[in-house]
Amino acid sequence: MASASGAMAKHEQILVLDPPTDLKFKGPFTDVVTTNLKLRNPSDRKVCFKVKTTAPRRYCVRPNSGIIDPGSTVTVSVMLQPFDYDPNEKSKHKFMVQTIFAPPNTSDMEAVWKEAKPDELMDSKLRCVFEMPNENDKLNDMEPSKAVPLNASKQDGPMPKPHSVSLNDTETRKLMEECKRLQGEMMKLSEENRHLRDEGLRLRKVAHSDKPGSTSTASFRDNVTSPLPSLLVVIAAIFIGFFLGKFIL
């Protein structure tokens, strides 16, 4: 009867553990390896907890004790210290999560655990599992890190182009307007050149008809007036060539 009543008095674990049974540590184990244990309190009462291990020198647990409010979750970080991994050696390390409902006005946690009765305690046990990554896992871990900069470079490469295109369009419009203006000036200069040439011919005819002996003077006059429009045409051509060259570049 006593054993039956003792068994009935044993409380089931009130917290929900994630993971529920195994704490998995993934190698290589040349550095500290951390795994997380989540403790969720689904009840409407505060719950005190503490985490124990069979190998306290091999692990660092933060936090290793505390109080969980109703409906809250606490994440416990379990840190495995570096060691020489032997695949033929099976891990015998275990953890235990021990809990008790927090009494009213809890202030001294040590006193709570010391004064706790065995039938008030709830516990869950977890075993430690060591996993060594294979070559495929290593390649899979490396591929995403390589893919990120490649995708980023493809996306980032063409980004400046729209800005440069808009600048070229604006510059093109300005150059086209300038070319049209210079073409108009060139047409005016050609018209003036034609007019001056006709005027020169008329003057030569008048000079020949009035004074036959003054051929040298008329020739001199023609040589002075003719280069002027030609020079203007050359200057206009230089300006047009300059702006067209800028447009092409």
Swiss-Prot record:
Biased composition (Basic and acidic residues): 135-144
Transmembrane segment boundaries: 228-248
GO biological process assignments: ceramide transport; cholesterol transport; COPII-coated vesicle budding; endoplasmic reticulum to Golgi vesicle-mediated transport; endoplasmic reticulum-plasma membrane tethering; membrane fusion; negative regulation by host of viral genome replication; neuron projection development
Tissue: Ubiquitous.
Site for Involved in binding the phosphorylated serine of the phospho-FFAT motif, residues: 50
Gene3D superfamilies: Immunoglobulins (2.60.40.10)
Modified residues (Phosphoserine): 166, 214, 216, 219
Annotated segments matching region phosphorylated FFAT motif binding: 50-53
Domain comment as written in the entry: The MSP domain binds the FFAT motif of many proteins.
Positions bearing N-acetylalanine: 2
Coiled coil: 169-205
PANTHER family (alphabetical): VESICLE-ASSOCIATED MEMBRANE PROTEIN-ASSOCIATED PROTEIN, VESICLE-ASSOCIATED MEMBRANE PROTEIN-ASSOCIATED PROTEIN A
GO cellular component: azurophil granule membrane; bicellular tight junction; cytosol; endoplasmic reticulum; endoplasmic reticulum membrane; Golgi membrane; microtubule cytoskeleton; nuclear membrane
The protein's name in its UniProt record: Vesicle-associated membrane protein-associated protein A
Chief location of this protein within or outside the cell: endoplasmic reticulum
Keyword NAD: no
GO MF annotation list: cadherin binding; FFAT motif binding; microtubule binding; protein domain specific binding; protein heterodimerization activity; protein homodimerization activity; protein-membrane adaptor activity
Chain positions found as N6-acetyllysine: 125
Region (Disordered), start-end ranges: 135-167
